[in-house]
A protein has these predicted regions:
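ATP-binding N-terminal substructure of ATP-dependent carboxylate-amine bond-forming enzymes
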Residues: 1-139, 143-145, 149, 156, ...
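Active-site nucleotide/adenylate-binding loops and adjacent lid/helix of ATP-dependent enzymes
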Residues: 2-9, 13-14, 21, 98-103, ...
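Residue-level detector of anion-binding/catalytic polar loops
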Residues: 36, 132, 160, 221, ...
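Short, flexible, mixed-charge acidic loops at enzyme active sites
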Residues: 52-56, 124, 259-266, 320
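A glycine- and small-aliphatic-rich helix-loop capping segment at beta-alpha/alpha-beta transitions
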Residues: 124-133, 204, 209, 336-337
Length: 353
């Protein structure tokens, strides 16, 4: 009997639309001979099965439903499209009812970028109800999603990182002292944002306070990091049984100030994979990726981002639910490794505990 997979996308962050694209791309590559795939759009308390019949999902349905929910429409109006319309997930049993029959999910494939899919909340739910899933644990996801906590954890592994200052909303801070410690320019970031949303590059001390307060409009804490000028590189890694598979390294080249949302998703960057770097540097980056993966206790697919300056590798951040759109970094690394997307996705599923 085929196992039933809940492929979950959407979420409550600015990345919900990208999450849908990632999830749809994953869905297209799951082997239907082995699995029944149900796509689940999550937005707040609304968890809606897009294809309760198990048939293919209309291409624009998830995005239309997301936009309707974001506009304040009740989920019931989204679900009122007749036969084959979305239905609610029963969160107590992680199941749904279709034509009088209860369908219970066997496992979850989380493709939500940001909250609640990348910060441990959704993982905690699945751990409580005993449903296996594809990402890092709730504990590891919570640590890696918070840039400050992640850096404090990883620094004990002997990995180099940019110097930083952490500020929580309501705390006092002195811009001159911060710049005196970190120099200029600096990057001002929310500690728990994704896809470079809310990041500002500050070049003058008098602009620092405005950048910090801009973050505080949406987030409770901020991390200010020194700028390290170098080559931006990223590396994916995933578990296949007892083996850790390290994907080729990608170099990111952009004419923008940094690799922000526009550079990532609107084509304003060039991703070179495999990166045109010495084999020795590639090996050191992959070794660092494996070192962090093991030290953090990661599982599933993870992507690590770095800056390399004069041969020194500086860790930037860990992505525990990396983008999986056709133009995302990991799928490009998979192609460069000579692995088909279908083989890759089904390997990830087979390794769900």
């Amino acid at each position: 009997m085929k196992k039933k997979i809940a492929l979950i996308y959407g979420g409550n962050s600015e990345e919900a639309g990208i999450s849908i694209q990632s999830g749809r791309n994953v869905s297209r590559n799951i082997c239907r001979e082995k699995y029944d795939v149900y796509e689940v759009l999550l937005k707040g308390v609304d968890w809606l099965v897009m294809n309760p019949s198990g048939d293919a999902v209309q291409d624009d349905l998830p995005q239309r439903c997301l936009e309707a929910l974001c506009a304040g429409e009740a989920a019931e109006s989204v679900m009122a499209a007749g036969a084959g319309a979305p239905v609610r997930v029963d969160k107590c049993t992680f199941s749904f009812v279709h034509q009088g029959e209860t369908v219970k999910f066997d496992m979850a494939f989380i493709m939500i970028h940001g909250t609640p899919g990348e910060n441990g909340l959704l993982q905690g739910y699945f751990e409580m109800i005993g449903v296996p899933y594809n990402t890092c644990s709730a504990y590891v996801s919570a640590i890696t999603f918070d840039k400050h906590s992640c850096k404090r954890f990883i620094e004990h592994a002997g990995v180099k990182m940019a110097k930083d200052v952490f500020i929580r909303r309501g705390s006092s801070y002195n811009p001159e002292e911060i710049i005196g410690e970190l120099g200029l320019p600096v990057f001002v970031k929310p500690t728990n944002g994704g896809s470079s949303f809310g990041i500002t590059k500050v070049k003058r001390v008098e602009d620092l306070e405005a950048a910090v307060e801009l973050v505080f409009k949406e987030y409770d804490s901020v991390i200010i990091e020194e700028s390290i000028v170098g080559r931006e590189l990223t590396n994916g890694i995933y578990a296949n049984g007892s083996e850790l598979v390290k994907l080729p390294v990608t170099e990111i080249v952009t004419t923008r100030e940094f690799f922000d949302y526009e550079a990532k998703y609107l084509g304003e960057s060039q991703e070179i994979c495999p990166a045109h770097i010495p084999d020795e540097l590639t090996a050191r980056i992959q070794q660092t990726t494996e070192k962090i993966y093991r030290y953090m206790g990661c599982s599933g697919l993870v992507r690590m981002d770095y800056i390399v300056r004069d041969g020194e590798i500086f860790f930037l951040e860990t992505n525990t639910v990396p983008g999986m759109t056709p133009m995302s970094l990991v799928p490009a690394q998979v192609r460069a490794a000579g692995i088909s997307m279908e083989e890759f996705v089904n390997t990830l599923i087979e390794n769900i505990c």
